């Protein structure tokens, strides 16, 4: 059965809007504190100094355990506020936003729903790991694969603040490449993964949920705090432990993942592909790819590998893929990872020709 506009509407009256408005208020306050205000101030730093800080990969200890602890400390100090906000919003979207509303906007498997997922991500400006809990919450409300993936990938890849930083620090030609390739990545990967998931028709369970939403109260008889606490714990337990463990593992692995950069790391296809693969799996805070690439370019890296890293480092990561292991099938996640590597490598080749 196909998803259609005949889905029943939500209950009328001002009370139907109170909980969604509360969700918007929490999201706006949280994003202002965690993202909008700090990034607004950082844009002036980027414009004035043509830098937003040092590379998070610099001066790595040679011992894997020391490298793991050092990287995890720096990483989590940079992202913990956004991670808390992501878990908070991922739980609240399940108890404050009516499921039938979400399905009307994001429920259909198609281009329109995918584009809306990408557009709704733009104010979030989160890294892939911090956006993952929100995506998990959306998927538990039966949001389509394409829309959920577009929301997830667009958060870091099409981050407006990152594009501005990139223009001031690396040059607007890099920012333009990131924008064009980013749109192709968000829309193309999401639509292809949607096809792989074979969910062009809405699951019957989702249709039943929408029908029930017209007649059953959103609170299912339980107190709001009880329902929210349950969703919050489920989301935390299924995403955060694996997140912490894999960040530690990648922190240790950076000793081998990122070799010493020098002029010999030119624009060869081997380096472009290798760094597209590494960039897809590695995890970084929001916008950290900019100082990483700036540092590597200063040491002699070619524009091809640099562009591959600019596309893949923020897009997804091994921790975020594992955080969403219960939200998407392994086939979908593998498709997303491989296509991200491919687009990263192609972006590197385009950069060699155009930049």
Question: Can you say where each PLM-predicted feature lies in the sequence?
Answer:
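Alpha-helical transmembrane segments in multi-pass membrane proteins
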Residues: 78, 82, 86, 90, ...
């Amino acid at each position: 059965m196909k998803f259609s506009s005949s889905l029943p509407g939500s209950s009328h009256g001002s009370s139907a809007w109170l909980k969604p408005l509360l969700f918007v208020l929490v999201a706006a306050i949280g994003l202002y504190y965690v993202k909008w205000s700090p990034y607004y101030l950082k844009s002036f730093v980027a414009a004035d100094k043509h830098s937003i800080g040092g590379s998070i990969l610099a001066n790595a200890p040679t011992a894997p355990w020391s490298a793991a602890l050092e990287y995890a400390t720096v990483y989590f100090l940079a992202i913990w506020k956004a991670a808390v906000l992501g878990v908070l919003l991922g739980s609240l979207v399940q108890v404050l936003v009516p499921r039938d509303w979400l399905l009307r906007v994001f429920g259909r498997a198609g281009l329109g729903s995918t584009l809306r997922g990408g557009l709704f991500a733009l104010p979030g400006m989160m890294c892939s790991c911090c956006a993952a809990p929100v995506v998990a919450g959306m998927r538990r409300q039966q949001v389509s694969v394409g829309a959920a993936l577009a929301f997830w990938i667009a958060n870091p890849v099409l981050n407006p603040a990152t594009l501005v930083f990139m223009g001031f620090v690396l040059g607007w030609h890099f920012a333009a490449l990131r924008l064009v390739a980013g749109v192709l990545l968000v829309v193309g990967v999401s639509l292809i993964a949607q096809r792989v998931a074979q969910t062009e028709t809405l699951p019957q369970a989702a249709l039943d949920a929408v029908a029930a939403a017209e007649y059953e109260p959103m609170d299912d008889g339980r107190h709001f705090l009880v329902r929210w606490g349950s969703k919050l714990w489920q989301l935390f337990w299924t995403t955060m432990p694996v997140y912490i463990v894999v960040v530690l593992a990648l922190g240790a692995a950076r000793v081998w993942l990122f070799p010493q950069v020098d002029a010999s790391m030119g624009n060869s296809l081997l380096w472009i592909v290798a760094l597209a693969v590494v960039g897809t799996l590695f995890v970084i805070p929001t916008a950290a790819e900019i100082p990483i690439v700036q540092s590597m370019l200063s040491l002699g890296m070619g524009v091809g590998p640099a562009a591959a890293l600019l596309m893949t480092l923020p897009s997804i990561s091994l921790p975020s893929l594992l955080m969403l292991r219960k939200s998407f099938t392994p086939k979908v996640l593998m498709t997303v990872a491989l296509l991200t590597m491919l687009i990263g490598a192609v972006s590197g080749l385009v950069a060699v020709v155009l930049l």
